[in-house]
Amino acid sequence: VSLTIRDDSKIQLNTPIIGVPAEKNLCVQAARLLQKESGTSLGVEISLEKLIPMGGGLGGGSSDAATTLLALNRLWDLNWSREELMELGLNLGADVPVFIFGENAFAEGIGEKLKPIKLLPAWYLVLTPPVHVSTADIFASKELTRNTIPVKIPPFSVGLGHNDLESVVCLAYPQVARHLEWLRQLNRTTMVAMTGSGACVFAEFITESAARMALASVPLGMSGFLVQGLDRHPMQDYTRRG
């Protein structure tokens, strides 16, 4: 996401995404919402380069919206606190607050009640099945039972985590199930799961070398990439403390 301040109040998207009207773009919505609530007379030009697949369950749109709020908080010299931006971001989507929070977190509610947690350093092999999963359709599925026992802190550990959506998505999208099956036969993984509502799936590794060996063995017909886990958002200091 690249942002350029305008002296007028216009909010302009320079890089529209095919199939997504500008008014539906979360970066545009974030900028307009912050402009309205802050009362600033400034505007912004937004350039967006998508590096991860849409409909992959990776939170790309929410992350872009959070980045827009954090950056404009500084560029427009608003000096809002992290908590204020998180509350505003919740209007854009349940996943936006965690990206503003800027730390690994245990989430409750719809994702807005966040508590920081410490995670060990890790690398992730992310596979991208060639399907687009509709989050709305998955949550509306009769196969989603919603009867999982809630997990609380302090007993929580990553090993206790479970994605209730995974079995529903695998039933509706066999390609997702096939990619998960391939990851589960790998050695030296510490976790294999689906991202959010899919379609992407991932395997966690403690070392970069193990992750790169797994990436090198991805078969023809599958594609993926490596990422390193972060414990702190690089823009975490773009807000006022308190």
Where are these regions (language model features)?
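ATP-binding N-lobe of GHMP and related small-molecule kinases
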Residues: 1-56, 74, 78-83, 110, ...
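A broadly conserved amphipathic alpha-helix scaffold signal in soluble, globular proteins
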Residues: 32, 67-74, 87-90
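Gly/Ser/Thr-rich beta-alpha loop segments that engage phosphate groups in nucleotides
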Residues: 27, 57-63, 95, 104, ...
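Short, basic/glycine-rich phosphate-binding loops at helix/coil junctions
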Residues: 7-20, 68, 90, 155-163
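Glycine/serine-rich anion-binding loops at beta->alpha junctions
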Residues: 47-76, 191-205
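ATP-dependent small-molecule kinase catalytic core of the GHMP/sugar-kinase superfamily
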Residues: 78-191, 204-242
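Residue-level signal for inorganic ion chemistry
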Residues: 1-3, 27, 61, 127, ...
